[in-house]
Amino acid sequence: MPFQFGTQPRRFPVEGGDSSIELEPGLSSSAACNGKEMSPTRQLRRCPGSHCLTITDVPVTVYATTRKPPAQSSKEMHPK
């Protein structure tokens, strides 16, 4: 029997905070992955192809504090 691509949903390892809820009967894997996955601790969103897992509702200050400051040139560090 030849293998048919897309006949079974792909499985990804469960990480901390990910939902452990299985698919409801009659719900396809693509319908479950589109939109939001709800978790008791955070909201997760998958892209339409189920390649990305994004944490939503993260404050902008989190991104601002995790960015590295721009490198200073030698002129700025040692003004004449």
From Swiss-Prot:
Region (Disordered) location: 1-44
One family name in Pfam for this protein: UPF0731
Domain of life: Eukaryota
Coiled coil: none
Family statement: Belongs to the FAM229 family.
Protein name: Protein FAM229B
Organism, scientific name: Homo sapiens (Human)
